[in-house]
């Protein structure tokens, strides 16, 4: 006769507790002074009419203003630190987006250049950032040019 096969006993598995999850400490770096200034500027630009917003932006990047020095210092420090670099770029992008919104909601017509609001915002922000490198005597002329580029120059020059 063939050997009868023995039935294997069914054993219950012991319930094991999952290993306790290790708490990961996340440290959020404090925002730099440049980030704080850029975000405050973005907030100020949000509700202002375009010509006023451009004047605020140009004033913020004037050669004697604090913002250009702070941004440059933060940029130098963040060159080897990805998180700091991204945070600074994000803060600058908030200024550009705020300016873009202001341009899009502006009651006046499109600028003579025919740019979309996002491209015009980028161009105007770059122009205002460049004002920091101009001699103080040329700032008023540069602001006038920025206003003309936007299509929001005062009537009669």
Named regions from a protein language model:
Residues 1-2, 9, 13-36:
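Helix-turn-helix
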Residues 32-67, 116-124:
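Hydrophobic alpha-helical connector segments
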Residues 35, 54, 58, 96, ...:
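Hydrophobic core segments within long, regular secondary-structure runs in both alpha-
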Residues 62-73, 82-108, 118, 141-145:
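Amphipathic alpha-helical packing segments from all-alpha helical-bundle domains
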Residues 84-85, 106-157:
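Hydrophobic/aromatic-rich alpha-helical bundle segments in the mid-to-C-terminal region
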């Amino acid at each position: 006769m063939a050997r009868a096969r023995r039935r294997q006993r069914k054993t219950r598995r012991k319930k094991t507790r999952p290993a306790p999850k290790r708490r990961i400490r996340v440290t959020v770096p404090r925002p730099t002074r440049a980030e704080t200034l850029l975000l405050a500027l973005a907030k100020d630009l949000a509700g202002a009419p375009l010509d006023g917003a451009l004047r605020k932006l140009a004033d913020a990047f004037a050669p004697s203003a604090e913002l250009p020095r702070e941004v440059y210092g933060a940029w130098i420090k963040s060159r080897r630190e990805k998180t700091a670099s991204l945070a600074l770029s994000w803060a600058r992008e908030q200024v550009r987006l705020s300016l873009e919104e202001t341009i899009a909601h502006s009651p006046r017509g499109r600028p003579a250049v025919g740019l979309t609001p996002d491209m015009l915002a980028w161009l105007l922000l770059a122009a205002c950032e460049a004002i920091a490198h101009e001699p103080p005597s040329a700032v008023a002329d540069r602001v006038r040019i920025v206003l003309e580029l936007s299509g929001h120059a005062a009537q009669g020059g």
